[in-house]
Amino acid sequence: MGMLRSRGWRLVGSVALAATLAAAGCANDTDTASTPTTAASTGDDRSTTTAEATTTAPERSCDQEPTMSPVEAAPVAATPSDVDVTSFDGTTIRLHWFPAPGDDRHPTVLMGPGWSQPGSTLAQDPILFGALGIAGMNEAGYNVLTWDPRGFGESTGLASVNDPEREGRDVQVLLDWVAEQRVAVVDRPGDPRVGMVGASYGGGIQLTVAAIDCRVDALVPSLAWHSLRTSLHKSETVKAGWAGFLNTAAVTFGGRLDPHISSAAESGVGQGILSDEDREWFISRGPGDLIDQVSVPTLFVQGTVDTLFTLDEAVVNYESLRSRNVPTAMIWFCGGHGTCLTDEGDATLVNERSFAWLDKYLKGNDSADTGDRVDVVDQNAKHWTAADYPVELADPVTAEGAGELTLDATSAAGPLAAPRSGANDILSGSVLAITPSKAATALEVKIDPGKVDALALGAPRLEMSYSGTTPAGDRPTRVFAQLVDDDTGIVLGNQITPIDIVLDGTQRDVSVDLEMIAFHLQPGHTVTLQLVATTVAYAQPRLGGSLDASKISISLPVANDVTPG
């Protein structure tokens, strides 16, 4: 097998930081296996040996046939691990093949990279997003396949944001190719025993592929999304910070993009809006409604401080699978597309649970301990577990207030001045400019938990009666809501929520769920709701004029059936 290697795109300085925002084929520092050193089949030896030769598969039914047979594949000269395969439409997809040591047959794990990146070829990737590393998976008895998605790395074509009809079908061809490998376990001819891991772009593709191809047997998507409408364009408000960041990363590293991507980034940053065509294009990208077609065991891993793909994206996906009795679990950790400003806690948990998930659902080891179905971490690195989500709720912690907010640039949330001392998440330095922070000028409501000593878990609810005026303009009218820990001055989860308002002088009411939180409420420790006029996280709204809130009500959900760790 070809040596795991560093690639030329791993640079230093600000350019490298731009690349790291979505890199996903990553090793946790618990992966300590040595670099594999032997080559294996690249397609000439085809296997029809069934899975029972090596392990027992979980019961399932799948009649998906190969989409291409045989797969047109060509080894890359001087790089034994690399193979170019021809996809359904003639696009060349570069794959990287790292079989487990020895000649036995093993299940295979496909590990997708992050946005703008080629497939990982590193034994231990430095980007600690909680995904599994190649060396660790090889040592655990898995073949590993990574690949350059279309539009990135050495693959041809245009990046289309995990379009089921493009990137989804590309991965189907990779499944076809794996089924032809001599060292791959197959459940029947053309149907390899396959799991998928990866974060961000490499998390989203898992859900898309599993929805269209039943040959996938287990998933561990980290930092994935449900809908690009709710994640990138919440309340019809563009996440301009991330839009610019993602577009810059792709262009910097030579990505070849569908024109809708650059168009949306330019209009989102420049005007604060998307064209109808661009909005519909992003909505059509997976998984969205395709999540209801995913029926394989799935472990969702999401970050409490992820400001790109927030917690609710994982929750919607999780609830779809749970409603259909598909084996699923969910872990929230302090990380993701963002920076953890509090204690990160157990750095090995995600890695251990991910391996256990693959062990149980890919190898068929029923004794593997996959942990609690729901495991979340609070601001003190304390873990809380639950039998399911949503959890049963106790009486909420509530507060009310009123006041006026002048809508000008002095009322702004962010940028963040500095990362937490000693922070080791790779994005700490590169996302400061687009991360919300406590505002110096805001309309505030103090929230006192009283005697409550419990976990606030889920989406706080904000209700407001208001009126106001603002000058005419093309930009949308918005205010933004965030919660601040008064002990530390840190915005809970670094999360801020846009609120669509109408400022025409008429008295109006608005109700909105804020971004989800996991925060330990304790007596004597207050939280403050801040309403601000603008934020670095979203496109600047129309400024000028003021908002007069005659009543603001905020409600924090309090979990009743969670167990502290």
Where are these regions (language model features)?
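N-terminal cap/lid segment of alpha/beta-hydrolase-fold proteins
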Residues: 63-104
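Accessory cap/linker subdomain of secreted extracellular hydrolases
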Residues: 58-72, 121, 127-131, 139, ...
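C-terminal motif of bacterial Sec signal peptides marking the signal peptidase cleavage site
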Residues: 22-25
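Short, low-complexity, disordered segments immediately C-terminal to signal peptides
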Residues: 27-56
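Short beta-strand/loop motif that positions the catalytic acidic residue
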Residues: 294, 300-302, 306
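Short substrate-entry loop that stabilizes the transition state in hydrolases
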Residues: 103-106, 111-141, 145, 150-156, ...
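C-terminal, loop-rich substrate-recognition/catalytic regions characterized by aromatic stacking residues
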Residues: 344-565
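Gly/Ser-rich "nucleophile elbow"/oxyanion-hole loop immediately N-terminal to the catalytic nucleophile
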Residues: 102-103, 158-166, 173-200
